[in-house]
Amino acid sequence: MVVKIGILKCGNIGMSPIIDLCLDERADRNDIDVRVLGSGAKMNPDQVEEVSKKMVEEKPDFIVYIGPNPAAPGPKKAREILAASGIPSVIIGDAPGIKDKDAMAEQGLGYVLIKCDPMIGARRQFLDPVEMAMFNADVIRVLAGTGALRVVQNAIDEMVFAVEEGKEISLPKIVITEQKAVDAMDFANPYAKAKAMAAFVMAEKTADIDVKGCFMTKEMEKYIPIVASAHETIRYAAKMVDEARELEKATDAVSRKPHAGDGKILNKCKLMEKPE
C-alpha cells in the first residue's frame, strides 16, 4: 500500500526544508506519497488556519505540522484544527514548544521538539537573505551531524510502518536532547560523539543568545553584536559536527541508514559495503 503523508510548513525552523526530503532521500520510495502545504515565512493565525484546513481536506493518513514555537497563536490554531480533524497528527517544533507539550498530548497530538534547532537573529540591521540562508545551512548541518535529524526521521517512519501494518498509529512524544540525538547516530568513536554533543549544546546556546538579542535588548548598538555572536556560535557548531564526521570517516565507521525502495530502513557502516 501507499501511505499518504500530509506535511504543513508554517514559518521556518532548521528542520523545515528537509522534513519531507529525509523520508525519501533518493526519491525512489514506492510506499509513501507526500503532499506539502505551507504559509511561507509567516505563521499568523489566519494563514495557518487556511493551509491547515486545506490539508485536512486532502485526507492524508497522517499529518506532520512543522514550524517555530508550537505555543504561539498561529501554531495553536493549527493544533486546534488538527486535533478536531480526527487525522493522526504530530507537531514538530523547537525548544519553546516544550512548555506546551502536555497541552499537545491532551489534544491528542504527538510532538517532536528539537532543542538544537535555534531561532535566528531576526534583526533587520543584521539579517538579510544571505545571512538567513547561511544560518539555516549551519543549523541543518548540526541537525544532521548530531543525530537530531535521524530521531525526527525515525519517528515519522514509525508512523508510516504502523499504517502499512494496519496498526493504530502511536503518536511520538519526544523532546530531542543531546543524548537522544547522539544515541541515534551510532558513533563508533567516543571523541566524535563528544564533538557532536558539544555541537548540540552550542546550538542550544545559540537560541538563548538570539532570544536575548531579539527580545530582551532594545539598544541597536547592543543587540547587533549579540545576534552576530549567536550566528558565529552556530557556525562553529556546524564545524564541530564536521570534525565529528571526519573522525568517523578516518576509521571507515560512518553510520548510514538509507531507505530501501519499499521504505525499509537499511544499515551500513563501511563505505564500500552494501546496506542491509
UniProtKB/Swiss-Prot annotation:
Gene Ontology molecular-function annotations: ferredoxin hydrogenase activity; methylenetetrahydromethanopterin dehydrogenase activity
Xref: Gene3D superfamilies: 6.10.140.120, F420-dependent methylenetetrahydromethanopterin dehydrogenase (MTD)
Origin species: Methanococcus vannielii (strain ATCC 35089 / DSM 1224 / JCM 13029 / OCM 148 / SB)
Stored HAMAP family: MTD
Lineage: Archaea, Methanobacteriati, Methanobacteriota, Methanomada group, Methanococci
Entry keyword set: Methanogenesis, One-carbon metabolism, Oxidoreductase
Protein name: F420-dependent methylenetetrahydromethanopterin dehydrogenase
Known pathway: One-carbon metabolism; methanogenesis from CO(2); 5,10-methylene-5,6,7,8-tetrahydromethanopterin from 5,10-methenyl-5,6,7,8-tetrahydromethanopterin (coenzyme F420 route): step 1/1
Cited NCBIfam families: PRK00994.1
Catalytic activity: 5,10-methylenetetrahydromethanopterin + oxidized coenzyme F420-(gamma-L-Glu)(n) + 2 H(+) = 5,10-methenyl-5,6,7,8-tetrahydromethanopterin + reduced coenzyme F420-(gamma-L-Glu)(n)
Family under the similarity heading: Belongs to the MTD family.
Gene Ontology terms: biological process: methanogenesis, from carbon dioxide; one-carbon metabolic process
Function: Catalyzes the reversible reduction of methenyl-H(4)MPT(+) to methylene-H(4)MPT.
Gene name of the encoded protein: mtd
Enzyme Commission number(s) from the entry: 1.5.98.1
